[in-house]
Amino acid sequence: MENTVKPQPRRAVVAAAAGFAAAAAYAIVGALQILVWNPLAAVPGATLGQIRAEMARADQPLTANWVLAWGMSGIVLATVVLLVTIIRMNSRVGPVVAAYLVLLVFAAPGHFFAGFGPGMSLADTFLVSGADHAPWGMLLYVVSAASLLALIVLIIRAGRSATAHAVRHG
């Protein structure tokens, strides 16, 4: 009997494109959450320029370096997976989807660490909580949790499929 798990290059490339879009959107929304939306929500009525100026006066600048490094690293990793999928014309959909799910799962702790310094700077300057004030950070964590659940389901299904294939083909 022939192997029933065949490469599906077109479907794999479509999955990679969707995964790239999801990972890039996560990085962009995460950076905007940390650098724009959260400061504006933490200090209602102030402009971003006023918030940044007050933070700089308090020697608690809202620096973007780590945030942008986090976002760009996610986009670079997503690009690598996309390019490998396009170049390898024998990619299967499952591993491509799994790669992007892993990126989305690990984006959450990265987002937390990238946002920790700016959040504490906001807290120290304006005497507010260092936690997220805008809702988008929580949405990103929900996306990561859903990605973890999807990854677990994907792994279980792949294991069951491999076991069934081994039983059928000895």
Specify the residue positions occupied by each region the protein language model found.
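Cytosolic juxtamembrane helix and N-cap/initiation of the first transmembrane helix
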Residues: 1-40, 154-163, 170
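Hydrophobic alpha-helical transmembrane segments
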Residues: 66-90, 94, 145-148
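Membrane-interfacial loop-to-transmembrane-helix junctions in polytopic alpha-helical membrane proteins
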Residues: 4, 8-11, 56-63, 88-91, ...
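Hydrophobic alpha-helical transmembrane segments of polytopic
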Residues: 15-23, 71, 95, 99-102, ...
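Cytoplasmic juxtamembrane regions at transmembrane-helix boundaries
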Residues: 2-14, 80-106, 161-170
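Hydrophobic transmembrane helix segments
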Residues: 21-69
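Aromatic-anchored segments of alpha-helical transmembrane domains
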Residues: 23-28, 102-112
